[in-house]
From Swiss-Prot:
Phosphothreonine modified-residue sites: T107, T443, T445, T569
Residues where N6-methyllysine is found: K557
Gene (UniProt): ALB
Binding-site residues for Ca(2+) 1, renumbered to this chain: E30, E267, D272, E275
Assembly and oligomerization: Interacts with FCGRT; this interaction regulates ALB homeostasis. Interacts with TASOR. In plasma, occurs in a covalently-linked complex with chromophore-bound alpha-1-microglobulin; this interaction does not prevent fatty acid binding to ALB.
GO biological process: cellular response to calcium ion starvation; cellular response to starvation; negative regulation of mitochondrial depolarization
GO molecular function annotations of the record: DNA binding; enterobactin binding; fatty acid binding; metal ion binding; pyridoxal phosphate binding; toxic substance binding
Name of the molecule in the record: Albumin
GO CC terms of this entry: blood microparticle; cytoplasm; protein-containing complex
Length: 607
């Protein structure tokens, strides 16, 4: 890369940065501005989501009352921006409203102390009390009752959906949840007139639930990235991913989008859902206006209404690679001026490297690309301090080979196992693996993570070879972030804390490198942990699996050094026991009689 070109890139990058950072014209009333930009429907939906994410235990009706009060106030300010209190910040207005809840102290305890603080400390305090694992009942489809409620009052029905999802997922991407609510509405509009409401609705709602869980996990990873590793880490992640998606866009264009996208997600992660949704709409507009220079895959997205358009752009497939991309070595391993470029503008030079490398490798995961960039940076730090830097960094690309081979080998090994045993037994293998790595972690968390990791096999192992690695490692990043978030709430393992906090890019290799925790004192064998009753027979299949997998994790905690064959024997005996007693005429009597025998045989098998 010639130096004049690099200077131009630096100038463009800086311009793009400042275009993204400078806010639009200031308004007398922020709340009036957002109300006018978003419209009443989306404004109310986003305020409901924001309040539900902060106060996760409050009844729906209480939130509706707060939302209506805020909306009426916004209308007043939209009519007259100079009216009383209309010049207050959104944090001040929303925080004041949350602090009027009469049951705040009784329901939330320490969260009520936040109300004694001033902004911005008050909002930061509210954020720290968001609960990623709230104690809320499972939501089960009830097609007849739900259709009756939908037909009676569609707006209330959809509001209840926003509320229920938001309070279970306190970092859900606000504007994206509005999109999913539209999907939810479409499912009920289609299925409620059907003769077989359940047959029509349940598969659709199950599929929507999977999309919701995936969307929630993606945004939680973004928010964790900000919280634990800062804005620079999020920008690096975004440069890598967007360069893969938009390989025809130049670096300045990718940089501008990354800067704006960073602002959008920072706002949503910070609870600023109105600003986030408004800025996302602006970014969507910009991308569609400049689609010719960004990606040939955007046209179908840009013809859609706003919520669908933004969702479509976020999920758009990678564009075709330009056919004339030169080899990277000339600019990043052979150029004698590399150290000068690097020292003059480190972040821009490294960003350019990450962009160029990522756009050529849609077959790599984002975290692998970040590990490569990190290795490149470390090499330049070392070589640029030596007597002959060009000779030192000339072979830097050779250092990337083991970084690439390690995850490729891991994906092949795991996909081979998945194809051999199927999803359920693959989950079991992962539950055993992770229980041995971190036996101190709670059994429900280990089972949840093992099941999620196991589903990655179903999602990724059937894909073409070129897509397996990015699919697997990108989804593993989501599952491991969930483990880190839950572990942070109740930390029990220094090894897990280290993997979670050292480096976002190195998380997966760190977890893969964990072995049997030799310092762990095995859990005492308790018969009641392995005692079951007839109610297991009527459970849905997934809940039945969770019961069995919980027993498996407990067995490993009791006997961490149990062999694969020992565990297979015990699990096989357990499955046979459940099948036998669920088929018996007197199920409870069978469980009472056969259960102690199972416990005894399990202890013997593990001895």
């Amino acid at each position: 890369m010639k130096w004049v070109t690099f200077v131009s890139l630096l100038f463009l990058f800086s311009s793009a940065y400042f275009r993204g950072v400078l806010r639009r014209d200031t308004h007398k009333s922020e709340i009036a501005h957002r109300f006018n930009d978003l419209g009443e429907k989306h404004f109310k939906g986003l305020v409901l989501v924001a309040f539900s994410q902060y106060l996760q235990q409050c009844p729906f009706e209480d939130h509706v009352k707060l939302v209506n009060e805020v909306t009426e106030f916004a209308k007043k300010c939209a009519a007259d921006e100079s009216a009383e209190n209309c010049d207050k910040s959104l944090h001040t207005l929303f925080g004041d409203k949350l602090c009027t809840v009469a049951t705040l102290r009784a329901t939330y305890g320490e969260l009520a102390d936040c109300c004694e603080k001033q902004e911005p400390e008050r909002n930061e305090c509210f954020l720290t009390h968001k609960d990623d694992h709230p104690n809320l009942p499972k939501l089960k489809p009830e097609p007849d009752a739900q259709c009756a409620a939908f037909q009676e009052d569609p707006d209330k029905f959809l509001g209840k959906y926003l509320y229920e999802v938001a309070r279970r997922h306190p970092y859900f991407y606000g504007p994206e949840l509005l999109f999913h609510a539209e999907e939810y509405k479409a499912d009920f509009t289609e299925c409620c007139p059907a003769d077989d409401k359940a047959g029509c609705l349940i598969p659709k709602l199950d599929a929507l639930k999977e999309r919701i869980l995936l969307s929630s996990a993606k945004e939680r990873l973004k928010c964790s990235s900000f919280q634990k590793f800062g804005e620079r880490a999020f920008k690096a992640w975004s440069v890598a991913r967007l360069s893969q998606k938009f390989p025809k866009a130049d670096f300045a264009e990718v940089s501008k989008i990354v800067t704006d996208l960073t602002k959008v997600h920072k706002e949503c992660c910070h609870g600023d859902l109105l600003e986030c949704a408004d800025d996302r709409a602006d970014l969507t507009k910009y991308i569609c206006e400049h689609q010719d220079s960004i990606s040939g895959k955007l046209k179908a997205c840009c013809d859609k209404p706003l919520l669908q358009k933004s969702h479509c752009i976020a999920e758009v497939k990678e564009d075709d690679l330009p056919s004339d991309l030169p080899a990277l070595a000339a600019d990043f391993a052979e150029d004698k001026e590399i150290c000068k470029h690097y020292k003059d503008a480190k972040d821009v030079f490294l960003g350019t490297f990450l962009y160029e490398y990522s756009r050529r490798h849609p077959d790599y995961s984002v975290s692998l690309l970040l590990r490569i960039a990190k290795t490149y940076e470390a090499t330049l730090e070392k070589c640029c301090a030596e007597a002959d830097p060009p000779a030192c960094y000339a072979t830097v690309f050779d250092q990337f080979t083991p970084l690439v081979e390690e995850p490729k080998s891991l994906v092949k090994k795991n996909c081979d196992l998945f194809e051999e045993v199927g999803e359920y037994d693959f989950q079991n293998a992962l539950i055993v693996r992770y229980t041995k790595k971190a036996p101190q972690v709670s059994t429900p968390t280990l089972v949840e993570i093992g099941r999620t990791l196991g589903k990655v096999g179903s999602r990724c192992c059937k894909l073409p070879e070129s897509e397996r690695l990015p699919c697997s490692e990108n989804h593993l990043a989501l599952a491991l972030n969930r483990l880190c978030v839950l572990h942070e709430k109740t930390p029990v393992s220094e090894k897990i804390t280290k993997c979670c906090t050292d480096s976002l890019a190195e998380r997966r290799p760190c977890f893969s490198a964990l072995e049997l925790d030799e310092g762990y004192i095995p859990k005492e064998f308790k018969a009641e942990t392995f005692t079951f009753h007839a109610d297991i027979c009527t459970l849905p299949e997934d809940e039945k699996q969770i019961k069995k997998q919980s027993a498996l994790a407990e067995l490993v905690k009791h006997k961490p050094k149990a062999t694969k064959e020992q565990l297979k024997t015990v699990l096989g005996n357990f499955s046979a026991f459940v099948a036998k007693c669920c088929g018996a005429e007197d199920k409870e009597a069978c469980f009472a009689e056969e259960g102690p025998k199972l416990v005894a045989s399990s202890q013997l098998a593990l001895a």
